Amino acid sequence: MRGLFKSKPRTPADIVRQTRDLLLYADRSNSFPDLRESKREEKMVELSKSIRDLKLILYGNSEAEPVAEACAQLTQEFFKADTLRRLLTSLPNLNLEARKDATQVVANLQRQQVNSRLIAADYLESNIDLMDFLVDGFENTDMALHYGTMFRECIRHQIVAKYVLDSEHVKKFFYYIQLPNFDIAADAAATFKELLTRHKSTVAEFLIKNEDWFFADYNSKLLESTNYITRRQAIKLLGDILLDRSNSAVMTKYVSSMDNLRILMNLLRESSKTIQIEAFHVFKLFVANQNKPSDIANILVANRNKLLRLLADIKPDKEDERFDADKAQVVREIANLKLRELA
């Protein structure tokens, strides 16, 4: 008879609903601090356990792989109501382990398909203000790394990345990348890179529309930063952007600017070999441009001897045939350049 009274195992949807109820309670208890502390602690322990259970369903463990049907049920219930919004806003109330678990849950859910559809993308499109919340999370020292991870996973969806690129949020990353907290600055840099490289057509459209202010800020705030790490990351990312075929129109305009060329020539003179090599990969685009404006060609001619001496000293630590071939081609081009009449 005892077996008749055993509680039914909770379904994935049950666990999501319980999590949602506990998140509601957590919000309420913060609004009403008079609620009994022991009761609150008990509920927060339950909430942490529920979030851990969600993670277990989505990721499995050492003994069992995740079950596709259970993951689909969980995902469907999670995005049916405002569970994501409640989880994000309640994150500061959780302990560190629960925050980590919640971050992993949100990250995983961005990849979960239900009936061959990423329903997280549909939810975020209808609740796009959550991206405003996540971006501003970089300013919260305790929460930045959690919100940053979630933000990167959310911009896997092209519609979400487009919203961020079309907003004023992009400008905030020039500041976040240089925050004094090294871990947060590095996380912001990783996020900025993801935003500018993942969705090729969306990024190309953004750069064409915003190239004037974007590259002016990129040059002054990142490439000319006093911070070595910022300069190193920025010149590497610039190379990734300009060498991508999707951005060929933007690249052609970038390498037609005297101001841009001066900045690159300064980076070639850096004491850091890493920065020199990354700068070379962008500098070679100025030299290789078959339709150089006269002022660009004339600067290269006027500085020919200095540039050739500089290039002779730039060598990667490991033998790199491709780099050597590129450098030889650049040296030949510079050696053969002639002064032109300015248009």
UniProtKB/Swiss-Prot annotation:
One Gene Ontology CC term in the entry: cytosol
InterPro entries associated with the record: ARM-like (IPR011989), ARM-type_fold (IPR016024), Mo25 (IPR013878)
SUPFAM superfamilies the record matches: ARM repeat
Sequence similarity: Belongs to the Mo25 family.
Name of this chain's protein: Putative MO25-like protein At4g17270
Lineage: Eukaryota, Viridiplantae, Streptophyta, Embryophyta, Tracheophyta
